[in-house]
Amino acid sequence: MKRTYQPNKRKRSKVHGFRARMSTRNGRKVLARRRRKGRKVLSA
């Protein structure tokens, strides 16, 4: 059986990237939460 994590930069940013987060209402909520918490890195 192959491993579940097969790194791919393009997919990573398409799914978890900043622009992906900004494109939906819930994604913007995620960023707002992470800003409020004081996360150094907001998105992948």
UniProtKB/Swiss-Prot annotation:
GO terms for molecular function: structural constituent of ribosome. Gene3D superfamilies: 1.10.287.3980. Pfam families: Ribosomal_L34. Keywords: Ribonucleoprotein, Ribosomal protein. The gene is rpmH. Residues 1-44 are annotated as: Disordered. This is Large ribosomal subunit protein bL34. Residues 1-19, 26-44 have a biased composition (Basic residues). PROSITE patterns: RIBOSOMAL_L34. GO terms for cellular component: ribonucleoprotein complex; ribosome. GO terms for biological process: translation. Belongs to the bacterial ribosomal protein bL34 family. It comes from the Bacteria. It comes from Geobacillus sp. (strain WCH70).
